[in-house]
């Protein structure tokens, strides 16, 4: 590798000796590869078209055959072949064939021809070195076989793996489509603080930092919820934020400590209204990104055509295990029944509601392949959701599961400040007892609720997991350009 780099550095010097700057300032590529391919698809084999073209990109392959040479040049949209002929280029032919390597960025001007083999080509009349690469590209046939290297050196992955480029193109389309869908319905995006004096809005461990001037401990936000609700109190009736969230938790194919979510709040709505909003928005996004509402994920066809299945957590657990949690008078009875069914009974699940959630996560969650809204969660695991209008002990909350993964979470928001204080104080007691993910009491948020918050439906969608679905990606690292990785060595 060091010898190859030295050779390329020698070529940098040679280019300068010949009056060619190896690191150019600018070039005007008037044409893109994909557009050339489509606009000139009718050019017959063996014929030329006398139209001036200018393209720029990275040299992916090169073949020198005596007085002829063929390069493959790639830009963001695709590739095109360069046809180089000594008779036409003169001394420049020797320069380009001896000093340009695979990986270099060059610009060329010329005309179009289609080879006898049917390959549309730019017949090069002049060339410009734009950037001399000092490192070789990965093998073009095998790409980056080392998956971790794909994540560590994403720039190489993007150069040699078209599917990776398509994944991030679709991610960008997904984000744009979500914002457009919400904007068209008069939702207003307002940015909320990333650095917060109180980490709230979710059960998660925060990252902690310190403001030197104020001598103040601060947290990277674990959710945007509490500040967006303050905005609803302030009179913004339809508000959202799409942005980064930070949670000091484990790394897996489903979790990255830094991830993207969109949270949406609509005054005078409830969780049933959020169901309609969620399935309508996601179906629309899928149509725009994938061309329809049916797609294949890891070999399984997924149908995102609304309406989607709705079922309560109690119904799904009973369907999967035969256990009716409404019949249990206390935790001991629920634990005994779960043990008899071979379900785990962790000590931290200290109530019937928490055991119901454990049974759901163990026996149901992974089997929810087609989009399913799971409704009506236990109150003790949902401290920010409104009590159910007709089911004691439950709240008006749903989670959306697709391919066995939670993709969205929504509530009829809790707007009673007294009830909210009691729930947050219970959370704070759990934190004091050692639960690092329990929330604390945010006094300013409670004061905002006391000013008065209208009935509100709230929704959060994990953008990364949604993009995994829309790009058929098995790992969250595949859809985050630069995922967090353990340092090498």
UniProtKB/Swiss-Prot annotation:
It catalyses: tRNA(Lys) + L-lysine + ATP = L-lysyl-tRNA(Lys) + AMP + diphosphate. GO terms for cellular component: cytosol. Mg(2+) 1 binds at residues 399, 406. Its cofactor is Mg(2+). InterPro entries: Aa-tRNA-synt_II (IPR004364), aa-tRNA-synth_II (IPR006195), aa-tRNA-synth_II/BPL/LPL (IPR045864), Lys-tRNA-ligase_II (IPR002313), Lys-tRNA-ligase_II_N (IPR044136), Lys-tRNA-synth_II_C (IPR018149), NA-bd_OB-fold (IPR012340), NA-bd_OB_tRNA (IPR004365). Binds 3 Mg(2+) ions per subunit. The keyword Chloroplast does not apply. Keywords: Aminoacyl-tRNA synthetase, ATP-binding, Cytoplasm, Ligase, Magnesium, Metal-binding, Nucleotide-binding, Protein biosynthesis. Mg(2+) 2 binds at residue 406. GO terms for biological process: lysyl-tRNA aminoacylation. It is an enzyme of class 6 (ligase). Its EC number is 6.1.1.6. PANTHER family: LYSINE--TRNA LIGASE, CHLOROPLASTIC_MITOCHONDRIAL (PTHR42918:SF15), LYSYL-TRNA SYNTHETASE (PTHR42918). HAMAP family: Lys_tRNA_synth_class2. Belongs to the class-II aminoacyl-tRNA synthetase family. This is Lysine--tRNA ligase.
């Amino acid at each position: 590798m060091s010898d190859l780099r030295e050779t390329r550095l020698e070529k940098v010097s040679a280019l300068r000796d010949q009056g060619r700057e190896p690191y150019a300032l600018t070039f005007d590529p008037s044409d893109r590869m994909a557009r050339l391919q489509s606009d000139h698809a009718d050019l017959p084999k063996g014929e030329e078209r006398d139209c001036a073209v200018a393209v720029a990109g990275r040299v992916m392959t090169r073949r020198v055959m005596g007085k002829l040479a063929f390069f493959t040049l790639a830009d963001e949209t695709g590739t095109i072949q360069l046809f180089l002929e000594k008779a036409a280029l003169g001394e420049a032919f020797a320069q380009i064939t001896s000093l340009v390597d695979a990986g270099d960025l060059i610009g060329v001007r010329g005309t179009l021809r289609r080879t006898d083999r049917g390959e549309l080509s730019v017949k090069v009349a002049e060339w410009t070195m734009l950037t001399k690469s000092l490192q070789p590209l990965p093998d073009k046939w095998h790409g980056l076989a080392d998956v971790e290297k794909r994540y560590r050196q994403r720039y190489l992955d993007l150069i040699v793996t078209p599917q990776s480029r398509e994944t991030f193109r679709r991610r960008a389309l997904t984000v744009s489509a979500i914002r457009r869908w919400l904007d068209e319905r008069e939702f207003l995006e307002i940015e909320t603080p990333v650095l917060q004096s109180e980490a709230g809005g979710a059960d998660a461990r925060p990252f902690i930092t310190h403001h030197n001037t104020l001598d103040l401990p601060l947290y990277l936000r674990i959710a945007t919820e509490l500040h967006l609700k303050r905005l609803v109190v302030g009179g913004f009736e339809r508000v959202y934020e799409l942005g980064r969230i930070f949670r000091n938790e484990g790394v897996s194919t489903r979790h990255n400590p830094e991830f993207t979510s969109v949270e949406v709040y609509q005054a005078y709505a409830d969780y049933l209204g959020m169901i309609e909003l969620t399935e309508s928005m996601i179906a629309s996004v899928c149509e725009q990104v994938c061309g329809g509402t049916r797609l294949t994920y890891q070999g399984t066809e997924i149908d995102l055509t609304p309406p989607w299945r709705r079922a309560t957590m109690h119904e799904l657990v009973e369907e999967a295990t035969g256990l009716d949690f409404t019949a249990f008078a206390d935790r001991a009875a629920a634990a005994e029944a779960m043990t008899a069914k071979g379900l785990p009974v962790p000590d931290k699940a200290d109530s019937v509601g928490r055991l119901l959630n454990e049974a759901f996560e163990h026996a149901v969650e992974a089997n929810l392949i087609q989009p399913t809204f799971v409704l009506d969660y236990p109150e003790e695991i949902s401290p920010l959701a409104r009590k159910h209008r007709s089911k004691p002990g439950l709240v008006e909350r749903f989670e959306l599961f697709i391919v066995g993964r939670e993709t969205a979470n929504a509530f009829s928001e809790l707007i009673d400040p007294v009830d909210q204080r009691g729930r947050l104080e219970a959370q704070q007691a759990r934190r004091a007892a050692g639960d690092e993910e329990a929330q604390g009491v945010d006094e300013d948020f409670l004061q905002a609720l006391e000013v008065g918050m209208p009935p509100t439906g709230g929704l959060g969608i994990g953008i990364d997991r949604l993009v995994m679905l829309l790009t058929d990606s098995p790992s969250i690292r595949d859809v985050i350009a630069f995922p967090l990785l353990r340092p090498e060595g």
